[in-house]
Amino acid sequence: HLLSRRQRQMCIRDRVNTLIMIVFSLLCIGAFGFWYHAGYNGIYLIHPRKVFHPLSIVGIILLVPGTQCLSTYLVSFTASLFPQWMKAYEKLMESTGINSGLTVSMFFYSILLAPIGEELLFRGVTMHQAKRVFPFWAANIMQALLFGLFHMNMIQGIYAFFLGMVLGYICEKGGSIYQSILFHMMFNFWGTIISGILPTGNSTLFFVLYFATGVICTFSGLILFRFGTNRLAQKQAAPLYLENTGYDTFYPSN
């Protein structure tokens, strides 16, 4: 009877925590979406061909497993140096109920709401505000650092900083926040769903191949992404493509 009561308490706790995260994301989307739209003359209803190039989409797809693999190594390396950080991280995951199992509401939050809200907050408002004062590289570091601090623990904060740098690069070089939102959604989908069904191993060969896969996918993804965004920028530079180029009004930087 005591165990069942504890299980009910944990179930209620998990639902409350999930509800809080969903409400927070909706508030972020509403507030920072309006700020980003009003401050940067964004266009919500756009044609995908004016934002995405097929090669840039392929590049983003390759970047997902690449950055996931490298993030895994980064977390493992950090945990080996600071095991107390990993214990604190595991305790946090247990207290919030994230490790209790994937529910429909948690899936909805992780794959859809969190990426949109976080991109509007960090790559949308924060990075673009910082670019008014600093060059892109400094603005990108600043928003990535804030993105890491936002996760409120060292383990997640370190790989969130790494991920934030990639997301900032995608948003800036792609010329649209839609690109970083797509990558963020796919990254979370991989970490939430796909990573749980992939084979694992403890052999040296497995770790070498896993790391090599991460490096190859990351660099090939970046190359294809830049090639696709450059092709798209060339089309947008033509007179017929100058109007309503997409959600953002800034052009991809070289």
Q: What is the predicted function of each stretch?
A:
Residues 185-254:
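C-terminal membrane module of polytopic membrane proteins
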Residues 16-62, 77-82, 175-176, 225-242:
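Membrane-helix interface linkers and caps
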Residues 1-12:
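Single conserved hydrophobic/aromatic residue that forms the stacking wall/gate
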